[in-house]
């Protein structure tokens, strides 16, 4: 949007798009627009609103959700939810730095119905313990919905 790849241009570009979507930025601090700085601050509600708006936007709606890797299948989430009912059925972008692990994306991956955002800060366990807790949480949240989808797909249509 602004030409040269400078930090302040990334922040301006993200702010411009988010404001066009009418998303409240009161509790948000964007430093670089990429999410790579510890100075960035945002809430799960803000991220969920961005995901929802991107999925509903006529210019990005059909494309944007397909750009995210599928858990248990590819990208940095290829080992997350592997072997569960959500493997391949939830698309998430991961982000991490020391003491921080975040996931944001869509469920189901095909024709998204829900924005999914999970931010963890200052955790005091191993990554494997955190991953196990995150997997139990996500499976618990979406397992009954996934069962409903599976039953519909296996029911003969009249």
Predicted regions and their residues:
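Short, contiguous acidic/charged loop-to-helix segments that flank catalytic cores in large enzymes
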Residues: 2, 37, 94-95, 123-128
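Active/binding-pocket-proximal capping segment
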Residues: 61-75, 136
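A small/polar active-site loop signature that marks catalytic segments
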Residues: 1-58, 62
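Active-site-proximal beta-strand/loop segments in catalytic clefts of secreted hydrolases
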Residues: 31-33, 67-72, 94, 118-121
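Active-site-proximal alpha-helical segments within enzyme catalytic domains
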Residues: 26, 38-60, 102-104, 108-121, ...
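Short, gly/Ser/Thr-rich active-site loops of penicillin-recognizing serine hydrolases
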Residues: 133-158
């Amino acid at each position: 949007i602004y030409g040269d790849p400078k930090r302040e241009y990334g922040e301006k570009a993200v702010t411009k798009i988010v404001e066009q979507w009418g998303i409240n930025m009161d509790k948000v601090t964007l430093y670089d627009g990429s999410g790579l700085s510890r100075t960035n601050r945002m809430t799960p509600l803000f991220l969920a609103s961005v995901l929802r708006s991107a999925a509903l936007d006529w210019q990005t709606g059909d494309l944007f959700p397909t750009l995210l890797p599928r858990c248990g299948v590819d990208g940095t989430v290829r080992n997350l939810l592997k072997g569960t009912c959500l493997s391949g059925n939830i698309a998430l972008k991961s982000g991490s730095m020391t003491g921080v692990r975040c996931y944001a994306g869509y469920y189901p991956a095909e024709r998204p119905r829900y924005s999914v955002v999970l931010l963890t800060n200052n955790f005091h366990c191993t990554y494997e313990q955190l991953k196990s807790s995150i997997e139990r949480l996500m499976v618990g949240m979406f397992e009954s919905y996934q069962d409903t989808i599976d039953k519909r797909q296996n029911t003969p249509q009249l």
